Amino acid sequence: ARSRQLLEMIERDYDFLSFSEAAKFMNFSEPYFSRYFKQQAGLSFSRYLNIVRTERALDLIKTDESLTMSEVAKQSGFNTIRNFNRIIKEITGYAPNQLPAGYSLDIRSACVGQEHFDPTLESTVLLPSSD
């Protein structure tokens, strides 16, 4: 139950939530939380948070063409435009300003990235769509 609350909190507070705050929310030490999250989700907390932030950024890019990339970065929780550009390219394969029209994030590919992700793990949690 607490794990589900954490995932809901990440979805809601992605723009300012930190690793330390998430560990504290779970009442875990940071090293234990790191292992726990990776075991439960199949990827690290930071990778998961970056995927959530990337989804938000892509939504903003699609729905509000008046926003600059700096505004999109800030509103989607990235602390610098450089970090925003790096993470978006790492997850999507495209620079934010070079995304193809109608681009849609493939979550499975995003989760794989540089880490092992096995969606068949018993501990893998599917999140409901925020649509």
Please tell me what each predicted stretch does:
Residues 16, 20-52, 73-98:
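Basic/polar phosphate-binding segments, predominantly the helix-turn-helix DNA-binding elements
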Residues 1-17, 23-26, 47-67:
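A short, Lys/Arg-enriched amphipathic alpha-helix from helix-turn-helix/homeodomain DNA-binding modules
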Residues 62, 75, 86-131:
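…primarily DNA-binding HTH/wHTH and HhH modules…
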